[in-house]
Swiss-Prot record:
It is found in: Cytoplasm. One of its GO terms (cellular component) is cytosol. Pathway: Cell wall biogenesis; peptidoglycan biosynthesis. Signal peptide: none annotated. Mg(2+) 2 binds at E306, N308. Keywords: ATP-binding, Cell shape, Cell wall biogenesis/degradation, Cytoplasm, Ligase, Magnesium, Manganese, Metal-binding, Nucleotide-binding, Peptidoglycan synthesis. InterPro entries: ATP-grasp (IPR011761), ATP_grasp_subdomain_1 (IPR013815), D-Ala_lig_Van_CS (IPR000291), D_ala_D_ala (IPR005905), Dala_Dala_lig_C (IPR011095), Dala_Dala_lig_N (IPR011127), PreATP-grasp_dom_sf (IPR016185). GO terms for biological process: cell wall organization; peptidoglycan biosynthetic process; regulation of cell shape. Belongs to the D-alanine--D-alanine ligase family. Mg(2+) 1 binds at D293, E306. This is D-alanine--D-alanine ligase. Pfam families: Dala_Dala_lig_C, Dala_Dala_lig_N.
């Protein structure tokens, strides 16, 4: 049986560039190379596209994925066919943050009519933008913590009024977040006005829009979702932190987190979380995969925090670990995602693009 052509795309013009490379290393070492002919495309921090074909060896040196000695190519040509000369069965974008997880590259794949793993333009973009995401959750009736959002230009013009709004609506501690970044990049926990001002300036280095959320004493619970029109969910897992704030450094550099899978919760609470994860999946019209993040208080109040349309696949990542607990191996999970991409593309072919 001939191998299917699959292309892994990673890197990207994003502050989460290095996380994407780490994710790509994990996926490349787990994907079934007996079933798939693997090509890779690395997008540099400057936006250049570099391609290497027929990856068969284990990737031990992560820096080799930066393809330093490879010349940049023309995007449409790089994506037009695989190393076997056939079109790709699917492209797997392992891109985190802006210019990759936000609907931009999904739009490119749509225009080129290439099957791709994961969410479409709408779901990717709305899951990336924390404010839009919150508005969609509110429309779906999902419970959330209070928040305030504003633009960089508004803050520079009306700083006093905005700080007053934050103090009127929220209580310390609060979390300041860039609206369009993940992996906890640019996020600050603030306990007073001085920290708030510093956190706002930090967040505005990464985005023109930010969200300030009410802090809460609660457990951080996550649910993985997999599927297209009829998604399945996992039992919830819990993020156990050795630090007060689960930031980028704690996540990816210090390893100061532990995953408790399944989470120690009442079954009724677990089922509520799973149902809410499906509601979040549908609220943003997702396809393929999603990770839904929640807060659960000691008295079992549940608040949805956010969703991640392209969860990490690193050795520390919750998403593949949750599915492994459900009996789905890492390699099989990748296979399922590729099959879902093909299914989504076949479904799209039923659409008419002209009027008879």
């Amino acid at each position: 049986m001939a191998k299917e052509n699959v292309c892994i795309v990673y890197g990207g013009k994003s502050a989460e560039h290095d996380v994407s490379i780490l994710t790509a290393q994990n996926v490349l070492n787990a994907i079934d190379k007996e079933q798939y002919q693997i090509d890779i495309i690395y997008i540099t921090n400057d936006g250049a596209w570099k391609k290497k074909e027929n990856i068969v060896d284990t990737i031990n040196d992560i820096d080799s994925l930066r393809l330093i000695d490879v010349e940049a190519g023309e995007i449409s040509k790089l994506l037009s066919q695989g190393s076997t000369g056939n079109a790709y069965s699917a492209v797997f974008p392992l891109l985190h943050g802006p210019n990759g997880e936000d609907g931009t590259i999904q739009g490119l794949f749509e225009v080129l009519d290439i099957p791709y793993v994961g969410n479409g333009v709408l779901a990717a973009s709305s899951s990336m933008d924390k404010l839009v995401m919150k508005q969609l959750f509110a429309h779906r009736g999902l419970p959330q913590l209070p928040y305030v959002s504003f633009l960089r230009s508004e803050y520079h013009k009306y700083e006093g009024n905005i700080l007053k709004l934050v103090h009127d609506k929220l209580e310390y501690p609060v979390f300041v977040k860039p609206a369009n970044l993940g992996s906890s990049v640019g996020i600050s926990k603030c306990n007073n006005e001085e920290e708030l001002k510093n956190g706002i300036e930090e967040a505005f280095q990464f985005d023109r829009k930010l969200v300030i959320e009410q802090g809460i004493e609660a457990r951080e619970i996550e649910v993985a979702v997999l599927g297209n029109d009829y998604p399945e969910t996992t039992w919830p897992g819990e993020v156990i932190k050795e630090v007060a704030f689960y930031d980028y450094k704690a996540k990816y550099k210090d390893g100061k987190i532990k995953l408790d899978i399944p989470a120690d919760l009442d079954e009724e609470v677990q089922m509520t979380l799973r149902n809410m994860a499906v509601e979040a999946f549908k609220a943003t019209d997702c396809a393929g995969l999603l990770r839904a993040d929640f807060f659960v208080t000691d008295d079992n109040q549940i608040f949805i925090n956010e969703t991640n349309a392209m969860p990490g696949f690193t050795a520390f990542s919750m998403y593949p670990s949750l599915w492994e607990n459900m009996g789905v191996s890492y390699s099989d999970l990748i296979k399922k995602l590729i099959e879902l991409a093909k299914e989504k593309h076949e479904d799209k072919k039923q659409n008419k693009y002209k009027i008879d």
